Amino acid sequence: MNPRQLEQMARQMQKEMMRIQEELANTTVEGTAGSYVTVTMNGHREIKSIKLAPEVVDPDDVETLQDLIVAAIADASKKAQELAEQRLGPLAGGMKLPGF
């Protein structure tokens, strides 16, 4: 493969990577902690919303609510990670990408 072909392939991969990054920014996943907390996050792991079931808001038990929020964020983050790996996997050739 000559240098010109390599450069063309690199540009094509970069263009595809940018397209996938934009797609990840516009794709959301939901993480949950039971039916009490739902966290919506995009493919870049940016939290877009947190929904709480009214019955979970108990001023006498704030710790449980905090634990549920953390669990829902962790669940959403895992799903966003899986989404990114799925979309970027073919470009990465099976390599683990840091930050994804």
Swiss-Prot record:
GO CC: one term? Answer: bacterial nucleoid
Query: In the record, what terms sit under GO molecular function?
Result: DNA binding
Instruction: List, alphabetically, the Gene3D superfamilies matched.
Output: Nucleoid-associated protein YbaB-like domain (3.30.1310.10)
Q: Name one Pfam family in it.
A: YbaB_DNA_bd
List the SUPFAM superfamilies. Answer: YbaB-like
Q: Does the keyword Thylakoid apply?
A: no
| The keyword DNA-binding is assigned to this record | yes
Q: What InterPro entries does the entry give?
A: YbaB-like_sf, YbaB/EbfC
* Keywords for the protein's UniProt record, in alphabetical order: Cytoplasm, DNA-binding
- Where does this polypeptide localize? Cytoplasm, Nucleoid
Q: Where is the signal peptide?
A: none
Q: Which family does it belong to?
A: Belongs to the YbaB/EbfC family.
What does the subunit comment say? Homodimer.
Protein role? Binds to DNA and alters its conformation. May be involved in regulation of gene expression, nucleoid organization and DNA protection.
HAMAP family documented for this protein: DNA_YbaB_EbfC
Q: Please give the name of this protein.
A: Nucleoid-associated protein RoseRS_1534
Q: Which organism is it from?
A: Roseiflexus sp. (strain RS-1)
